[in-house]
């Protein structure tokens, strides 16, 4: 009842039956469910894609094996948003030059079964603003920014660049948007910041 339209969670940390129950509760509340892939190898990533089908989520965010994942998701209605660029390590880091990442974004966006992109912009060690503008300007699919979203300034920068959305996780649990506030108040602070920059 705070105005969230999308709620996401990672594919690790809870047993499958608890993830399934969580997805069902989110849907019952009228929100769409986003599953974030947290995998360090191809096998785990493909397992996460299969889990997205079994969980009944609406979006699958992340992953670097788009050809295989689009085959798994074909006909499911799940909107898949892979990572453009070269993603390494855990927590994930985005590597490569802006042109290389932008070309990866173009290639992915043109693939059948890809509905958007999940850009690890703040996990990039170069010019983040230039990267985001380059990727958003190069594709005709929604661009979601994930990772290290921890300030109103970053929300404003992404809005100015024209991203479709962003994910926030740890910053809410760490109280980065409203010091000493409840989880609900943290979410409300992020939504308020988003509305302010969108108007």
Task: Locate the predicted segments by residue.
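Conserved N-terminal beta1-alpha1 strand-loop-helix module at the mouth
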Residues: 1-33, 39-43, 51-56, 106-113, ...
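Hydrophobic faces of well-ordered beta-strands that scaffold small-molecule active sites
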Residues: 5-9, 33-37, 60-62, 80-83, ...
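Charged helix-capping and loop-helix junction motifs
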Residues: 20, 95-103, 127-133, 180-187
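Helix C-cap/helix->beta junction micro-motif
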Residues: 29-30, 76, 139
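Conserved anion-binding
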Residues: 38, 42-124, 189
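Short, acidic/turn-prone active-site loops that include or flank metal/cofactor-
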Residues: 12-13, 38-40, 84-88, 148-149, ...
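Glycine-rich phosphate-binding active-site loops on the catalytic face of alpha/beta enzymes
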Residues: 54-68, 112-124, 148-150, 154, ...
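Catalytic cores of alpha/beta
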Residues: 42-54, 96-103, 130-145, 149-168
């Amino acid at each position: 009842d705070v105005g969230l339209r999308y709620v996401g969670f990672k594919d690790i940390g809870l047993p499958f039956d608890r993830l399934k129950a969580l997805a069902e509760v989110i849907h019952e509340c009228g929100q769409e469910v986003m599953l974030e892939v947290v995998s360090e190898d191809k096998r785990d990533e493909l397992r996460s894609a299969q889990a997205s089908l079994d969980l009944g989520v609406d979006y699958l965010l992340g992953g670097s094996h788009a050809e295989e994942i689009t085959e798994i998701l074909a006909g499911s209605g799940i909107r898949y948003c892979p990572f453009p660029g070269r993603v390494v390590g855990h927590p994930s880091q985005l590597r490569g030059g802006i042109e290389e990442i932008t070309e990866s974004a173009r290639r992915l966006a043109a693939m059948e079964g890809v509905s958007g992109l999940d850009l690890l912009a703040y996990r990039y060690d170069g010019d983040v603003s230039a990267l985001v503008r380059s990727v958003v300007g190069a594709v005709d699919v929604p661009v979601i920014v994930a990772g290290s979203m921890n300030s109103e300034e970053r929300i404003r920068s992404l809005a100015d660049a024209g991203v479709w959305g962003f994910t926030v996780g740890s910053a809410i649990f760490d109280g980065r948007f409203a010091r000493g506030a409840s989880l609900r108040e943290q979410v409300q602070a992020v939504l308020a910041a988003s509305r302010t920059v969108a108007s």
